[in-house]
Swiss-Prot record:
It is a multi-pass membrane protein. The gene is OR5L2. The keyword Disulfide bond applies. Disulfide bonds join C97-C189. This is Olfactory receptor 5L2. The keyword Protein biosynthesis does not apply. It comes from Homo sapiens. Pfam families: 7tm_4.
């Protein structure tokens, strides 16, 4: 690419999901509804866990952090996406774009590791119930959660610092609904081989480590479940694990598709639709999947609602 076609940029233009005028209202209402449910479910779950002593256990400690990350995850992307649906000026400043990517990457990597930690927590709870509270001590819970946030922050700093070194772009139009790294790299004039290689390697390493932890945990859980004599208890355990694995599969599957392909620079329409699942849909589904059929959560919610009504 000739230097005459390259320039520094003060802002980027986000094309969004679709430029079809007839779809604007439908898309706006759909994503507004999803965002509303996401806020209500995740903030509600976090608040319920804090106020209910019944839920002061390791599994809900991790779930409260997952809900917090999902709330942040969604809030980083969806409000700007909703505003751009009707805005003629779909601009975002260069700094705003970099900040959005940094926060998005931090939350994304943190969530991936949190899901692995939660799978390990389920393994300890089901396979070693008598030692569960001793094994998953307050100290270990804090250390594991801190490690998740640390990994997210480090990965984000690596990618963001390298992205900030790109000075010239051949265009400022991003074919996406938020500032993600692959479409940004596709616009760069300079050599971004290091960026693309690191993105591929870091994403692949994170996915490999966390998927290995998750699969190992659930295989051991499955082995334990098969030894349960009660058909009802076995069915309950299977259904719970199946719902958890569904959420994990969708989340990890889309991440593998988007980021674990060498030189996946151009963000086409298929990539954007795939990205919607783990940036918009999964943050809404996670609190529902992890608590919908949970008796402890339902009892705690009824108790809190009952006390509010009678107060």
């Amino acid at each position: 690419m000739g230097k005459e076609n390259c320039t520094t940029v003060a802002e980027f233009i986000l094309l969004g999901l679709s430029d079809v005028p007839e779809l604007r209202v439908c898309l706006f209402l759909l994503f507004l509804l999803i965002y509303g449910v996401t806020l209500l479910a995740n903030l509600g779950m976090t608040a319920l866990i804090q106020v209910s002593s019944r839920l002061h256990t390791p599994v809900y400690f991790f779930l409260s952090h997952l809900s917090f990350v999902d709330f942040c995850y969604s809030s980083i992307i969806v409000p700007k996406m909703l505003a751009n649906i009707f805005n003629k000026d779909k601009a975002i400043s260069f700094l705003g774009c970099m900040v959005q990517f940094y926060l998005f990457c931090t939350c994304g990597v943190t969530e991936v590791f949190l899901l692995a930690v939660m799978a390990y927590d389920r393994f300890v709870a089901i396979c070693n119930p008598l030692l569960y509270m001793v094994t998953m001590s307050q100290k270990l819970r804090v250390e594991l959660t801190s490690c998740c946030y640390f990994c997210g922050t480090v990965c984000s700093l690596i990618h963001s610092s390298l992205a900030l070194r790109i000075l010239f772009y051949r265009s400022n139009v991003i074919n996406h609904f938020f500032c993600d790294l692959p479409p940004l790299l596709s616009l760069a004039c300079s050599d971004v081989t290091v960026n693309e290689t690191l993105l591929f390697l870091v994403a692949t390493l994170n996915e490999s480590v966390t998927i290995m932890i998750i699969l190992t945990s659930y295989l051991l859980i499955l082995t334990t479940i098969l030894k349960i004599h009660s058909a009802e208890s076995r069915h309950k355990a299977f259904s719970t694990c199946a719902s958890h694995l569904t959420a994990i599969t969708v989340s990890h599957g889309t991440i593998l598709y988007i980021y674990c392909r060498p030189s996946s620079g151009n963000s086409g329409d298929v990539d954007k639709v795939a990205t919607v699942f783990y940036t918009v849909v999964i943050p809404m589904l996670n609190p529902l999947i992890y608590s919908l059929r949970n008796k402890d959560v339902n009892k705690a919610l009824r108790k809190v609602m009952g006390s509010k009504i009678h107060s």
